[in-house]
Swiss-Prot record:
Heme b b562 binds at residues 84, 183. GO terms for biological process: mitochondrial electron transport, ubiquinol to cytochrome c. Keywords: Electron transport, Heme, Iron, Membrane, Metal-binding, Mitochondrion, Mitochondrion inner membrane, Respiratory chain, Transmembrane, Transmembrane helix, Transport, Ubiquinone. Component of the ubiquinol-cytochrome c reductase complex (complex III or cytochrome b-c1 complex) that is part of the mitochondrial respiratory chain. The b-c1 complex mediates electron transfer from ubiquinol to cytochrome c. Contributes to the generation of a proton gradient across the mitochondrial membrane that is then used for ATP synthesis. One of its GO terms (cellular component) is mitochondrial inner membrane. It is found in: Mitochondrion inner membrane. This is Cytochrome b. CDD domains: cytochrome_b_C (cd00290), Cytochrome_b_N (cd00284). The lineage of its organism: Eukaryota, Metazoa, Chordata, Craniata, Vertebrata. It comes from Oceanodroma furcata (Fork-tailed storm-petrel). The keyword Methyltransferase does not apply. Heme 1 (or BL or b562) is low-potential and absorbs at about 562 nm, and heme 2 (or BH or b566) is high-potential and absorbs at about 566 nm. SUPFAM superfamilies: a domain/subunit of cytochrome bc1 complex (Ubiquinol-cytochrome c reductase), Transmembrane di-heme cytochromes.
Amino acid sequence: MAPNPRKSHPLLKMINNSLIDLPTPPNISAWWNFGSLLALCLMTQILTGLLLAMHYTADTTLAFSSVAHTCRNVQYGWLIRNMHANGASFFFICIYMHIGRGFYYGSYLHKETWNTGVLLLLTLMATAFVGYVLPWGQMSFWGATVITNMFSAIPYIGQTIVEWAWGGFSVDNPTLTRFFALHFLLPFMIAGLTLIHLTFLHESGSNNPLGIVSNCDKIPFHPYYSLKDILGLALLLLPLTTMALFSPNLLGDPENFTPANPLVTPPHIKPEWYFLFAYAILRSIPNKLGGVLALAASVLVLFLSPLLHKSKQRTMAFRPLSQLLFWTLVANLFILTWIGSQPVEHPFIIIGQLASTTYFTILLILFPITSALENKMLNF
């Protein structure tokens, strides 16, 4: 019998083992769809971004008008831009859901997969930040100024790092040029990290809602999950295109319709919605260095998840106390997101400080204690 090229050809064999004949647990739920949705988001962002880059000019005098030109004069330029801007929001929705699922079902015990995933999140955040600066509107300019300025809180070398990042003594043309270069480069870095992420995942195999080894009853990825993923893709593209066509500026900041002006500060500087939780944590500490450390810790704390797992069971499926804590954490993140969008005044300051304290308390203290308590209750 002739050898099947799908199983013998060096390249096709890799694709086959990753997407077609991949042994997959038979009981994974829709929460496992977000990985493929993230891949779709990345491909969409790279494609729309490439088309936008063809019409964009990375110069402070021309950036704003080049974006306006893309929307007015380029064939479907408005649609490409709206898909790209809102695609970023959906990218973050998917990655937050993906992380939440990993946290709920104990997927972080695949340490290498989890750690590369956290690195992917950090790279995505960096990409989104430098991308937000490119239209060179008011919020782009002041967002870049405020966020890059945080590095000046680092003792001794902080100010030097900031001036090195800016390419001068303020956010100006060199900053915009290098941010464009970085925004073009980082998505390909994300694609590379994704391959590493998948390599580690396929080494250990997927987790499942029960958190138990399912080697004995695994099923091939195609056609079962490939079809299920296509449904997920349709359900993602529907709200994305609806948003891009009907309310493209819903999640944007009105300040960004005004060209950047270093002489006029917007009344309330805030990042895009997907960074607001971290921004609220940053603002909840009245000290600059303390705020920056808390901001970094808000994401880097994810690296500690495997070390803080004290339960004898992997998932939270049969741990009601941990479930309660998990959903409290989710609610807390919504509160932080809301606080980040509010001005720095009473009562928002105290709510932000309480929510920030709760965030770290739940993750670092309450989860391990609750896990140990549940072990005792189950006589483990």
